[in-house]
């Protein structure tokens, strides 16, 4: 936990933000894997 998850949970569009963050993380892992 950090302050970032707290801010994300406060945003009305947290869902979309969470999905976006997950996609970014997945892209990061994919780039690191290749």
UniProtKB/Swiss-Prot annotation:
GO terms for cellular component: lysosome. One of its GO terms (molecular function) is N4-(beta-N-acetylglucosaminyl)-L-asparaginase activity. Keywords: Autocatalytic cleavage, Hydrolase, Lysosome, Protease. It is found in: Lysosome. It catalyses: N(4)-(beta-N-acetyl-D-glucosaminyl)-L-asparagine + H2O = N-acetyl-beta-D-glucosaminylamine + L-aspartate + H(+). It comes from the Eukaryota. Its EC number is 3.5.1.26. Its main location: other. The active site is at 18 (nucleophile). Heterotetramer of two alpha and two beta chains arranged as a dimer of alpha/beta heterodimers. This is N(4)-(Beta-N-acetylglucosaminyl)-L-asparaginase. It comes from Sus scrofa (Pig). The lineage of its organism: Eukaryota, Metazoa, Chordata, Craniata, Vertebrata.
């Amino acid at each position: 936990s950090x302050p970032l998850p707290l801010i994300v949970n406060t945003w009305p569009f947290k869902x979309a933000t969470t999905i976006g963050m997950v996609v970014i993380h997945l892209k990061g892992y994919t780039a690191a894997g290749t």
